[in-house]
Every structure is written in C-alpha cells, then in structure tokens.
C-alpha cells in the first residue's frame, strides 16, 4: 500500500484564485486585496499570475488586446495584474510572478530536445502540469533577502471551462495533494447577475461554475460573489448549500467606489479572518494605519486637478494602467483628486486642436508607446505646454518627443526619430547599438529591449534632483531607442537641459527646462509609474501634480503688484500638500 503523506501546518500556505461565468470580474484586484489584508496582519505575502495564453510574455501583444505591459525590477515583461500585486503589497516582485503557457511549453520542449525525459512520451499530464507545479512551488522559496513567504497567492487567469486553463487548474489541484490540504485554499470569483425585468439576483451561473470546477477535482473553500449590489443572506445560504461552501465563505462584493476600498469590503465580509482560520495562520488584528490613511486621502481630497493624458491607446485605459494609478497616487500625496482627461494624440496636431484639447487642463502627461501614429499630435501637445507654461511630464516615448520638439525649435526642422523616419537627415533619436539587429529583423523581437532597473545620475540643483531628493536614482526601463549624443549641444541651445544620464554619461535618462524657464517641464526615458505605490507615491508624479496644482491656483489667483495673492496661493498649496503626513520615498522611488 502507498504510504500516507504527512504535511507541516507551518509550511508556506498556497491560495489559488480562479474565476467563473465571465472574465473581467476582478480576480486580480480580489487577490491583491486579500494579499494586502494578510500583509496588514503581519504576514509575508507574495503573489503570482498564471496566464493561459501561448505567448511567452505580453511584450509583443497589442495594447488594445492586452492592456499595459508591466516591467519588473529584473526586466520581465509581465501581465498588468502584477502591477496591482506590487501596488497593494507594496513590494517588488520578480519575473517568477508571471507564468504563461508559452513559457511552460517552451521549457518542456527544450527539455525534451535535451533528452531530459529519458525517452518518455511527453504529455500534458504529467510533463506540462509538473512544469507548472514547479513554477508555483518555486514561489515559496526564499526571496532576495532570504525570507520565505508565509503565503503565496496564485491567480489563475481565464475562466473555468476554458480549454486553455485546464492544465493550470489541474496543476493547482495536484499542489493541494502534494503540500497537504491544510496548506491550500481555493477561492473562486463568480458573477451573480441581476436581472432588471424580474428584479432578481440569479445564483444558477455560480452553481454551474462551481460544478465545472468540481469536475476538475477542485472544491472551492470560499466564493467571491460579484454583483452590482449586496447579495442578501438568503441567497448566500442558498449558494452555500448548493455549492457545499460554508456560509462564512460566501463573500458578497458589490462594486466599490474605489479599488482601494476593496480590502475594506473583503474585511467587512470576514474573508481574511476565514482564510486565516482555515489555513491555521497566526491570528493578528489588521493594522489599518497605512491603508486607513490612504483611504482618507482617496475620499477626502482638498483640491481637484485636471491632467490630460495625451496617448495613442486612450480607447483602452488599461493600456496606461500604471500611469493612471501613479497620477492618482501623486494626487494622494497632495491631498488632491486627479481627474484624467483622455486625449487622443491625433487631436493635438494643430495649434487649434491642442488649444481645444488642452485649454482647460492643469497639466499634460505624454506616456510611452511605439510606432509613428499620433507622434505629430504628441509634439503639438508638447509645444502647447511649453508655450503656455503648462506643467508637463513625459515618459519614455514622451522624452523622445520632447527632444524632437526641442530640436525642431532650434532650426532642425526635419528632426525625428529613427523609429519613425529611418532616413531622416537629423536622427536626434537613434537606435541603441545593441538593438540594431532586432530592428533589421535579424534577432527576436520579444524580450530584447532594454528592460528592467537601471541607475541614473542627476545634475545637482536640477528640477528632477529636487523632486527625488537625491542625485542618484534607479528606474525601470522598456525601450530600443535613445537620444543621439551627436545632437546634444545643438538641442541644448533650445534651453532644454539634459539633467540625468546613465552613470557613464552616455545615455540620456532625464531632460527638463530649468525652473526659471518653465514651472515644471520634465521627461524621463524610464517608466517611473511602475514603481509608484498608492501608499508611497513616486516623487516625480507627486512633484508633477504639485506643479499642476500651483498652475491651477495661479490661474485662480493672479499675481498682484505686491505679491499678496501669490502668497495666498502658496499658503493654499502648502495646506493642500500636507506632505508631512506622506510616507517618505527613497531615491529609488
């Protein structure tokens, strides 16, 4: 007879989050919020996303299909949910946090070619599922600081019933068998639709979703009941009975006013306490000090500021998810609500178009992107912000567009990027040397950009150095093109200052117009939005929103000859910022 296994109750616990009925129910936010609650109870939590698509990573996927690509410190291109994980846990994750079917199959096929399966017939079970399990269990190993997590939360992408998700669900089922049932918790997110004609909430879709999960061999321990309203106790009892789940494990999650309210919603329903009891974790009260301060700033802003996001993919806001969350966090730092005006970059190609799109905003943000479409509109928005003294922040492609606009302003009329016009006579933005084979089609496109965290040195006394409070910083990157150093001196005649470079001085990382020329005009080749946290806003975004507030208040309170109204504006800004209450941000953001 096979020997029975013994499992330690002190082992790392695994929580699997699956979804049913429909996609886009908020599995990622649910998982992130539960992670935040467990972290607030004093536990060390890490998270992982299993994506069932065949792409190796989302790096080459259309932003309109996938949304943004979130880059980790170690340079992995990952799903946007990993950004939620980092923001809610307030910790950096690695490339291990995102596993795709493409990665799994690539690894298994490579092992087969090397003969590692000793002549076995390679199959989905056990070879694919074993590879998935190894990646799940690897998350319970020590992190860079040598600490093992108390809890690993793994979100399984897709919907129960999808063909693509079946190997991942089977692997999760096997993990429960391998590490012990007491060490695994299955949380299933399901839709409870409301039918307006009959005025009823319907439980049948959830029942069918759980039945499909059971057919795979997984009995959920708790259910997240997604609805646009509270699920009444009678329906909770019915769902608990029909799905064989404790009533305490049936969690009603109506739509919340803010994503940062979701931890409070889950806590009020008792989910975190239920998980702690079921897994035998140490029971500590939730420390709401940090998150409660955040919610106060979310719901009690003292000012409102309007920021134009001038982008190419504005029809799908998820394409700029980290940017919008970083803007909102910059607002939290200044006790302000940030309203985002989504501006298609094409709308700003003409001066009249830029005036119509940007005339009523307090700041302009130029985000990253690829390709020539909409570039002239971005240049028009930059020109408008420069002439009108409207605060501007450029990110990645935003820096490249700022440099092109500055070059054209000093007589290099056909200045352009080698990306948009390879034959331009003035390639002020050029292809990085190690990217030329990729551009020529002689190397892989995916996973070959300049990716991950890189250091930069900032000029003493510069706007960016003052914003960071340091002259040495580190930011994450994702690009193939750089400022052409042959044009630095000529571009500098426009007044644009190259205020931050790589430590060797070769790569331009930050540009700006000095404070005596413009109230705030900064651009970076990096993606600082990826390091922003709601509880620790990134200093560049905090400074940008602060400048936008000043711009707004100066419009409201014009300067008189004695400067009295300027002083009044400064007092109002100082009160609204209230920076002493914001957690300090280190030089790395």
Curated annotation (Swiss-Prot):
Recorded superkingdom: Bacteria
Entry protein name: CTP synthase
Binding-site positions, CTP: 23, 162-164, 202-207, 238
Glutamine amidotransferase type-1 domain span: 306-554
UniProt xrefs under CDD domains: CTPS_N, GATase1_CTP_Synthase
Region spans: Amidoligase domain: 1-281
NCBIfam families according to UniProt: PRK05380.1, PyrG
Source organism of the structure: Rhodococcus opacus (strain B4)
Pfam families: CTP_synth_N, GATase
Gene3D superfamilies in UniProt: 3.40.50.880, P-loop containing nucleotide triphosphate hydrolases
Assembly and binders: Homotetramer.
Annotated function: Catalyzes the ATP-dependent amination of UTP to CTP with either L-glutamine or ammonia as the source of nitrogen. Regulates intracellular CTP levels through interactions with the four ribonucleotide triphosphates.
Family recorded in the similarity comment: Belongs to the CTP synthase family.
Binding annotation for UTP: 23, 202-207, 238
Pathway participation: Pyrimidine metabolism; CTP biosynthesis via de novo pathway; CTP from UDP: step 2/2
Region forming the signal peptide: none
Keyword Magnesium attached: yes
Molecular functions per Gene Ontology: ATP binding; CTP synthase activity; glutaminase activity; identical protein binding; metal ion binding
Taxonomic placement: Bacteria, Bacillati, Actinomycetota, Actinomycetes, Mycobacteriales
């Amino acid at each position: 007879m096979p020997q029975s296994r013994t499992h330690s109750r002190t082992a790392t616990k695994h929580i699997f989050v699956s979804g049913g009925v429909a996609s886009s129910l908020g599995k990622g936010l649910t998982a992130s919020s539960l992670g935040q609650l467990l972290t607030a109870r004093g536990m060390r939590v890490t998270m992982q996303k299993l994506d069932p698509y065949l792409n190796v990573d989302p790096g080459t996927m259309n932003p309109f299909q996938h949304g943004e690509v979130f880059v980790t410190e170690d340079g992995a291109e990952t799903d946007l949910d990993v950004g939620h994980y980092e923001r809610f846990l307030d910790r950096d994750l690695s490339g291990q946090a995102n596993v795709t079917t493409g990665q799994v199959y690539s690894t298994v096929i490579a092992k087969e070619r090397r003969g590692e399966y000793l002549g076995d017939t390679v199959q989905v079970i056990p070879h694919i599922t074993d590879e998935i399990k190894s990646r799940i269990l690897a998350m319970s190993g020590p992190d860079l600081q040598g600490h093992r997590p108390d809890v690993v939360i793994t979100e399984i992408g897709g919907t129960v019933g999808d063909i693509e998700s079946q190997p991942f669900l089977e692997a999760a089922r096997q993990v429960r068998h391998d590490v012990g049932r007491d060490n695994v918790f299955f949380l299933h997110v399901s839709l409870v639709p409301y039918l307006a004609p009959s005025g009823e909430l319907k439980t049948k879709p959830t029942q069918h979703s759980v039945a499909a999960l059971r057919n795979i061999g997984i009995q959920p321990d708790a259910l997240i009941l997604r609805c646009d309203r509270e699920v009444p106790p009678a329906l909770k009892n019915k769902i608990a009975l029909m799905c064989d789940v404790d009533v305490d494990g049936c969690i009603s999650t109506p739509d919340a006013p803010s994503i940062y309210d979701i931890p409070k919603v889950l806590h009020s329903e008792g989910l975190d306490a239920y998980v702690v009891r079921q897994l035998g974790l140490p029971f500590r009260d939730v420390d709401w000090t940090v998150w409660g301060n955040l919610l106060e700033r979310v719901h009690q802003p003292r000012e409102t500021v309007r920021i134009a996001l001038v982008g190419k993919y504005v029809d799908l806001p998820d394409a700029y998810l980290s940017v919008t969350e970083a803007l909102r966090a910059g607002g939290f730092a200044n006790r302000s609500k940030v309203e985002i005006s989504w501006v298609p970059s094409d709308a700003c190609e003409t001066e009249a178009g830029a005036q119509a799109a940007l005339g009523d905003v307090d700041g302009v943000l130029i985000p990253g992107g690829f390709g020539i479409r909409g570039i002239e509109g971005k240049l028009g928005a930059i020109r408008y912000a420069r002439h009108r003294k409207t605060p501007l922040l450029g990110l990645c492609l935003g820096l490249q567009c700022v440099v092109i606009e500055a070059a054209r302003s000093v007589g290099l009329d056909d200045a352009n990027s080698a990306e948009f016009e390879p034959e331009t006579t003035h390639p002020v933005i050029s292809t990085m040397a190690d990217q030329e084979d990729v551009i020529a089609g002689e190397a892989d496109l995916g996973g070959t950009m300049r990716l991950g965290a890189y250091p930069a040195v900032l000029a003493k006394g510069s706007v960016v150095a003052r914003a960071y409070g340091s002259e040495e910083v580190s930011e994450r990157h994702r690009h193939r093109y750089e400022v052409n150093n042959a044009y630095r001196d000529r571009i500098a005649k426009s007044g644009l200052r190259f205020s931050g470079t790589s430590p060797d001085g070769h790569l331009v990382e930050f540009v700006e117009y000095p404070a005596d020329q413009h109230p705030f005009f900064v651009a970076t080749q990096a993606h600082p939005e990826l390091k922003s946290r709601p509880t620790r806003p990134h200093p560049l975004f905090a400074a940008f929103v602060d400048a936008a507030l000043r711009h707004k208040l100066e419009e409201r309170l014009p300067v008189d000859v004695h400067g009295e109204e300027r002083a009044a504006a400064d007092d109002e800004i100082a009160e609204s910022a209230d920076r002493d209450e914001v957690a300090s941000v280190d030089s790395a953001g």
